[in-house]
Amino acid sequence: ATFDAAGARLFTATWDARLWAIGEHRTAAGEALLPGTGYLELVAEALKAQGETGAFEIRDLYFLRPLAIPEGAARDMRLRLARSDAGYDFAVQSAAEAEPGGRVGFQLNAEGRIGFGLTPPRPLDLAAIEARCRDGLREDPAGLRSPQEAHLDFGPRWRVLRREAYGPGPEGRGEVEP
């Protein structure tokens, strides 16, 4: 990690589609993408590298454009972590050519804010949630198919949801297997 001219921490990497989290997360047309949860993991890892170990909250998260990696190519990316009054602001950027063979700059893929000082949530009563969530039960030991699979081609490591059910209102439960 380095720092930019404003003193913000910069975490950089070069990725290609051999990284399973990207190579096994493709559009139906075959384009490899960093999944949305990948941005969250990047933020968590950057905070850890920054020495932040407490609970945090991501606010005002905007996905502005996909971080796509063409087959057989690599893409430079960076995460900028800048201190703010509430915690940090972050931006994830990926390298982009202004025109083929032209100058390379960075485009903004996602941005958000990070806050601290959260009160830890109280423990969940999993038995009570399970008792309420009996509708729409679906299960498959090999992994349930996601509605997103109509548009995305996931590799086998993404099919982790084994069981799901819903309760009254906006409540549901799922069982995942890593």
Predicted regions and their residues:
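Acyl-thioester-processing domains in fatty-acid/polyketide/NRPS systems
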Residues: A1-P178
